[in-house]
């Protein structure tokens, strides 16, 4: 018995999500496009809204922020037309993540609030946990580490009660990053190891790649450069296979730091130039600021105070622009350590 077009579209969407989880991003995009083309613009609105949003998230995870934004906006149009509160709430949450990446934290917080309100009305418990986690990321950016940890812990407990391993791995990644920033390296290592077990059990190549990269940052911090290099290389190779520009840029930043720690300053500068170029089209202001901070560190190590100053001044402006007060204060101290002009 042949499938109807909506049934065929639903099957294609399922295959797209499976391909995405395996890291087969090009195949996933193609399957989403095939599904979207089959769906009727009058009768299949709920699935159309979901498919567009999931395709947008794939774009977002690859660093294609504007493409993600367009998909999310289209998804919301169809969600409004069919009256799906759940699809609307998910759409607002996704747009909030885009606003956060672009450094518009006020708009991001507004959208998270709207998403939470609609999700509550729709009874979307899992989404409320995701929003709680995302608000924790905002707090982390703003330097409210106690608040961020509380948000993460709340969402983690909710996802653990629901046996939602996928969501648990997301929250553990954010907790690991927070503990790395705070210098709680052993806790961060334990958190990342736990998350990696989950990601590998689920064959989730995307999450595993991100976790490996964030774990590499911990290895650098504790001086285990060989382990850091291996983790960074794994993440970079996987990201390049997926055309994941966001993770590629982050991995290049990490590799440049490893090179700097080993005294290969010229190579570190060359790697950072490639990374900065890779990051230019991503609209991720925080990542761009982190790249500039690294560029300043290596320039200072080379004895080039003028280049270091230029990079750190721009980094400080970017950190302040996204509300990252903790990082902006660190840059101010670095600038103060440079010799006067």
Enumerate the predicted regions with their spans:
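C-terminal non-catalytic interaction modules
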Residues: 1-4, 8-15, 274-277, 281-341
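Conserved alpha-helical positions within TPR/SEL1-like repeat arrays
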Residues: 13-21, 47-61, 86-101, 112, ...
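Amphipathic alpha-helical segments of tetratricopeptide repeats
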Residues: 36-37, 76-83, 114-124, 154-164, ...
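Eukaryotic tandem repeat interaction scaffolds
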Residues: 178-290
């Amino acid at each position: 018995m042949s499938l109807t077009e909506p049934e065929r579209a639903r099957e294609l969407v399922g295959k797209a999500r499976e391909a995405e989880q395996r890291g087969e991003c090009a195949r996933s995009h193609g399957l989403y496009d095939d599904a979207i083309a089959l769906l009727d613009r009058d009768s299949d609105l709920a699935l159309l809204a979901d498919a567009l949003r999931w395709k947008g998230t794939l774009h977002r995870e690859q660093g294609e922020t504007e493409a993600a934004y367009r998909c999310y906006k289209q998804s919301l149009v169809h969600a409004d037309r069919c009256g799906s509160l759940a699809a609307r709430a998910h759409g607002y949450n996704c747009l909030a993540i885009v606003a956060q990446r672009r450094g518009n934290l006020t708009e991001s917080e507004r959208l998270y609030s709207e998403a939470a309100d609609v999700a509550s009305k729709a009874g979307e418990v899992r989404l409320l946990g995701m929003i709680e986690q995302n608000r924790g990321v905002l707090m982390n950016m703003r330097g409210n580490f106690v608040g961020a940890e509380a948000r993460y812990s709340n969402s983690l407990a909710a996802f653990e009660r629901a046996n939602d391993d996928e969501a648990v791995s997301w929250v553990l990644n954010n907790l690991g990053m927070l503990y790395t920033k705070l210098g709680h390296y052993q806790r961060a290592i334990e958190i990342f190891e736990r998350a990696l077990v989950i990601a590998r059990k689920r064959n989730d190549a995307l999450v595993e790649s991100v976790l490996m990269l964030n774990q590499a940052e911990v290895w650098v911090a504790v001086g285990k450069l060989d382990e850091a290099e291996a983790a960074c290389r794994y993440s970079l190779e996987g990201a390049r296979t997926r055309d994941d520009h966001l993770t590629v840029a982050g991995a290049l930043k990490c590799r440049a730091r490893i090179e700097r720690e080993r005294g290969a300053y010229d190579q570190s500068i060359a790697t950072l130039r490639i990374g900065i170029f890779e990051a230019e089209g991503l609209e991720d202001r925080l990542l761009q600021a982190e790249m500039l901070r690294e560029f300043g560190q290596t320039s200072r190590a080379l004895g080039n105070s003028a280049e270091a100053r230029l990079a750190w001044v721009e980094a400080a402006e970017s950190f302040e622009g996204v509300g990252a007060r903790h990082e902006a204060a660190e840059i101010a101290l670095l600038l103060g350590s440079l010799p006067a002009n």
